[in-house]
């Protein structure tokens, strides 16, 4: 481990999280890469998994494996109780009013597509406007592009400040009487910017518009209440918040969901079927056709329990501190470009940067050789990259198990990359 620390490290304080205890809960963090300790800084792509969640998956298949909602035998009843129990766990976690407002999907992408298909095709008319930010992940852009083309609607993009925050002055002008939908990220996966969702939602609702929030980056890191945000839809994924892959959540207001037609058709989403027509099930099951991802949904509940035990305020406190420290260390590199808000309290634990004359992919490979996992590329945000006038960035992203020491290890590797590439001189 590096032994030379900056003055910022000497004065930095860790949050109340017991990071070493937390790290012991994550088996993969004990792995070495080519003899080097794994430093996992790609949490915006997916988080690592605690042993309690992994054990929950194993226990399900060893003790409870059965289909849900359809059997009267003990295994099916127990599996159904666990599955629906997770729905209630999710409801409490995001402050929803009723568990029937929680729809399980395959991920954030499917959740947003569900709204675009089921709500959008019913409600968006020619001449309507769909308002987005320039920071949107392709998953919260491409579905609206397709819908706008089909319905002859128009996409409108909010402005950003030089610091990568939403320009609220022009937002009040761009969200207007033609706005039918505001689809906005809770937190940028490139800039780390935390969006003022409630303020934007109020502007949209004054115009009679509906508000959808892409919470893929926000929900795992911020205390989230759909009531406080005052939105109509929230989409997020469990794999970014300690859960397994293949599980997403769509929350929507009950009255809006009730008015929407199903997204997919088949078993379990019906109440009765005749030869000529069918009657659809009630919420939430009318949006959950077929056998669901039972085991992973149940294990997702265990992941939420883990976060609840830590406390989301404490999770946020830790990320602010480690992000502030990372920003201060990265600034030591002469010529480095760091994207997004300078104030760590206005951003999440996502830090994108570029070093002069070093391609992000080359940098990512050099860091990988040092056992450090980051992301390099456009991060599924090509329009934003065009606005930033770059092809891509390097991105380090932090979570509950990352430490100041790992930031120092990142810095040591970046300095080594500087030497290897012969480009950047440190101050």
Could you tell me what each predicted segment is?
Residues 3-427:
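Pyridoxal 5′-phosphate
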